[in-house]
């Protein structure tokens, strides 16, 4: 204690002298002592503290007791002095070495099937799985920014790899420049930068082909992630190209449809030669067939026949001439009853009328016409157009009621050579029958009338009458509802006092 006090006094004098600019060992005067005439006042003020200087800074005599608070204050101490209590040094802190928890595995509760008790282990496994699943769902539910897309895929893949255990990471080396194929099976024990991916040999073959293609383009480290939708995505970071350079672009996601179109490019149907089809088939020998040829071959057991245009058949028979009209140009060559070659016009005429076609009907060019729909009438169309032009408003009302009308019942009979046939009529077409195919009535048209309806159908009111009646009923109901309201208004007007009218005397 004495040595400490002596050292403290010495250091205090040394620091004070150094701060005042004096050499060590020489203390500077106080500001009060430096002023002229203030030295006496300073010494007078410091007299009450002289005993402190003696007790604190003077070395004590050997065998004397250490100074106390009472002696420092100038009060003689008569009470028994206590021995100061020694403080024990603090005990050193003890830190246990941190040991990471053991890796999660399912081996500790396989004895459940053997009849052992493992409820605690099973509950811990369930809790860990629920926690990992919640973490995955939380990562999926967060809003994704374009810059953090790859980071999110990496985090999800790491969580899935931690969840799936008992498997192994399978690494394959792709062909080409030897870039590693980052394919991992489900159940990798340690986290890896490659996500959990394809689990079949087909996906591995597809990956190798795609990796070779992109390796030729200078981009490596591609992987297939079947858990993320079966798409092909680039590896994390930029892949290395041949020569140690870095690829300057990152590939975007490629859809499975685009991948399928890429791998089916270059196929051709061996039957019809088609190169585009929604689905490719194979025949018995393994050759590719388009969808139409493949279905025909599967249903009929033979290749689908190819139809050739009929107009090209005349060019394949040069020198052929019609025996009736001596023409050499026709869309289709026919044979008559005697087996002679005739043109298309003469053959059809003889087939319809059983007589040869007269030469006066011969045309210099082939007459082509548009096929008209069945049961069509030109006059009906013309009359409808004339009515629309004459009265547009009436035509609009007519179209409105035609749309509101229910479709007619099935059934009116049409005469034909085969018998009676049931057909559904159209609204804007007249009922026209098919002529009998007799020799004398080939060109005659027979018009049939619609079948008679039952009395219940004929007595049914028309839509016009129904609308008129409904409108009248609504009007009557509206009037009945409005009458009490008008009576109330009239009564209120009668009960209200008359309004006061100002006269010229009120302003005086």
From Swiss-Prot:
Basic residues: bias regions: 487-497
Biological process per Gene Ontology, one example term: negative regulation of transcription by RNA polymerase II
Disordered as annotated region, ranges: 50-122, 178-197, 364-389, 436-460, 487-508
Protein name: Transcription factor BCFI
Main location: nucleus
SMART domains: ZnF_GATA (SM00401)
Localization, UniProt: Nucleus
Bias (Low complexity): 66-79, 186-197
An example Gene Ontology molecular-function term: zinc ion binding
Functional note: Regulates the expression of chorion genes through binding to gene promoter elements identical to those recognized by the GATA family of transcription factors. Isoform 1 may act as a gonad-specific trans-activator while isoform 2 and isoform 3 may serve as ubiquitous transcriptional modulators.
Keywords carried by this UniProt record: Activator, DNA-binding, Metal-binding, Nucleus, Repeat, Transcription, Transcription regulation, Zinc, Zinc-finger
Tissue-specific expression: Isoform 1 is present in the ovary and the testis, isoform 2 is found in the larval and pupal tissues, while isoform 3 is found only in some pupal tissues.
A Pfam family reported for this protein in Swiss-Prot or TrEMBL: GATA
Species this protein is from: Bombyx mori
Entry-linked InterPro entries: Transcription_factor_GATA (IPR039355), Znf_GATA (IPR000679), Znf_NHR/GATA (IPR013088)
Entry keyword DNA-binding: yes
GO cellular component, one term: nucleus
């Amino acid at each position: 204690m004495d040595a400490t006090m002596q050292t403290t006094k010495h250091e205090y004098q040394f620091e004070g002298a150094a701060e005042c600019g004096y050499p060590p060992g020489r203390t500077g005067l106080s500001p009060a002592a430096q002023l002229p005439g203030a030295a006496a006042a300073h010494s007078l003020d410091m007299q009450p503290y002289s005993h402190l200087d003696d007790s604190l800074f003077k070395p004590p005599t050997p065998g004397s007791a250490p100074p106390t608070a009472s002696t420092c204050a100038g009060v003689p101490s008569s009470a028994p002095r206590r021995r100061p209590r020694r403080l024990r040094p603090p005990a050193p802190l003890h830190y246990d070495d941190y040991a990471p928890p053991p890796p999660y595995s399912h081996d500790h509760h396989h004895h459940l099937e053997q009849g052992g008790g493992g409820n605690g282990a099973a509950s811990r496994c369930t809790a860990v799985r629920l926690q990992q699943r919640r973490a995955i769902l939380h990562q999926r539910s967060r809003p994704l920014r374009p810059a953090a897309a790859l980071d999110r895929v990496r985090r999800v893949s790491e969580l899935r790899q931690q969840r799936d255990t008992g498997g192994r990471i399978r690494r394959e080396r792709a062909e080409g420049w030897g870039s590693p194929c980052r394919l991992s099976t489900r159940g990798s024990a340690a986290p890896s930068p490659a996500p959990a991916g394809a689990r079949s040999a087909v996906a591995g073959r597809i990956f190798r082909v795609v990796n070779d293609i992109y390796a030729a383009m200078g981009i490596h480290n591609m992987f297939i992630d079947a858990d993320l939708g079966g798409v092909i995505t680039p590896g994390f970071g930029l892949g290395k190209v041949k020569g140690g350079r870095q690829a300057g672009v990152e590939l975007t996601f490629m859809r499975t449809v685009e991948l399928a179109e890429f791998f089916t490019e270059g196929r051709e149907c061996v039957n019809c030669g088609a190169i585009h089809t929604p689905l490719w088939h194979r025949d018995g020998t393994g050759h590719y067939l388009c969808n139409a040829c493949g279905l025909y071959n599967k249903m009929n057991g033979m290749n689908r026949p190819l139809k050739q245009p009929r107009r090209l058949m005349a060019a394949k028979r040069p020198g052929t001439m019609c025996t009736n009209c001596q023409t050499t140009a026709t869309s289709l060559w026919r044979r008559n009853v005697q087996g002679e070659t005739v043109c298309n016009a003469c053959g059809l005429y003889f087939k319809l009328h059983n007589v040869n076609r007269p030469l006066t009907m011969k045309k210099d060019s082939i007459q082509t016409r548009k096929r008209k729909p069945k049961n069509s009438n030109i006059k009906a169309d013309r009359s409808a157009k004339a009515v629309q032009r004459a009265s547009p408003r009436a035509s609009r009302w007519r179209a409105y009621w035609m749309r509101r009308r229910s479709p007619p019942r099935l059934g009116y009979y049409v005469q034909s050579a085969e018998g009676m046939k049931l057909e559904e009529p159209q609204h804007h077409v007249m009922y026209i029958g098919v002529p009998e195919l007799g020799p004398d009535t080939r060109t005659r048209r027979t018009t049939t009338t619609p079948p008679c309806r039952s009395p219940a159908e004929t007595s049914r009111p028309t839509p016009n009458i129904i609308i008129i009646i409904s409108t009248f009923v609504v009007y009557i109901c509206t009037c009945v509802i409005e009458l009490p309201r008008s009576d109330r208004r009239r009564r209120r007007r009668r009960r209200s006092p008359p309004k006061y009218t100002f006269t010229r005397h009120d302003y005086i």
